[in-house]
Amino acid sequence: GPANLVTAARTAKQFLTFVNGGPFQPATAVGLRLPDSYFEGLRVGLQATRDRLCDVLTDIGFTVFTPEASYFATVDIRPIDPSGDGYEFCRRLPAKAGVVAVPNEVFYARPHYGRHMVRFAYCKQMHVINAAADALVKGFAS
């Protein structure tokens, strides 16, 4: 196959060798046959849900780090929660706004570096993002 695709698949494979990657092989084959328009549709859809979520988070008052490529938008909670405790913020968030976030500190070797950051997923359908946006606005209206 094309050298760039083989290299990419081989690189991914080296990080998957600790699990059985059998199910990924047919999925990869199908994906390689999909038209570019499929991936363009994914890009456009993810950009729209990202922008909607990031706009709402910004309007609420978070410092938002809008990603160029990801499924997650990271925010600094300190403008909203001066304690900067992302873990506790994420524990309270479902009761406050009916949505969840993940504290970024769990991804750090030195958790205190990410303590004030949390991430929200935007890899959802737009109606789900809209419902979450409404819930966040309502939850932080006070």
Predicted segments, located by residue:
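PLP-dependent class I/II
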Residues: 1-142
